[in-house]
Amino acid sequence: CLESLKKVSYSNYTIIVADNNSSDNSVETINADYPNIPLVRLDKNYGYAGGNNRAFNSLKEDESEYVIFLNNDTVVDENFIFPLIEPFLTNKNIYQTVPKIFYQKNPKLIWYAGGNVNLWTGKVSHKGIRQYDNEKYNLKSLTKYATGCCFCMRYNDFKEIGGFDENFPMYSEDVDLSLTIRKQGNEVWYIPESIIWHKVSASIGGSFSLSKNMKKLRGLFLLFKKHANPFQYLSIILLSPFIILFQFVNLLFTIKK
């Protein structure tokens, strides 16, 4: 990830790495290989939401107009930054932009080309996942949510909205952020001109993790409780056996990291 970031064409940017109290030698490796990159070391693992919030709080407001949140298991195209920033220049209602994301091991196979959220059925999914790239995924468009793997926001917008909700310790915090943005009348845009690759596998029969799937389900139901209206929530409760079944059937196609 850091090697690809060093090659981006955008000139005015700073890389900041947040270490969520890792127990391996990540900190030592980064300090040795990238001594000029600021490293935010957290005193414990705050999860995705808490870790990113604390990394954001380390930024200086007068030096940060835009912020890109990026997972460490990614590789970026050298031109990925400006397409994410450009929409903000002409539309103040755009609060979040998100790139097209491919599987790294299969660089033409899509991992994310927009997000679907249905608060009646409880379905949350990626558009285009495991589909080969084609013209229909090359159009800028409003989308329901931006994946936390990579997205861009104005510094002030992220601060105004309060960052990630840390009641989501793992999973669905990215969906929650986008739904909060949209509830306020603002927009989330999918930007296919910006491209990154995610180091996950699209193979059938990925690693089975019961605890991981249970955490995903917990995150989903926290999401529904927060954002669904009473009728939608009743619908989701009635459909919950099918939602749970869908999550476990989806393990056949789960992402193996």
Question: Which residue ranges define each predicted feature?
Answer:
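Short beta-strand-to-loop acidic/aromatic patch adjacent to the donor-nucleotide binding site
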Residues: 63-75
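Glycine-rich, basic loop-to-helix element that forms the pyrophosphate-binding segment
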Residues: 41-62
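Short, flexible, basic/aromatic active-site loop/helix in glycosyltransferases
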Residues: 117-144
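Active-site-adjacent helix/loop segment of glycosyltransferases
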Residues: 183-256
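Short beta-strand/loop segment that forms part of the nucleotide-sugar
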Residues: 12-21, 40-42
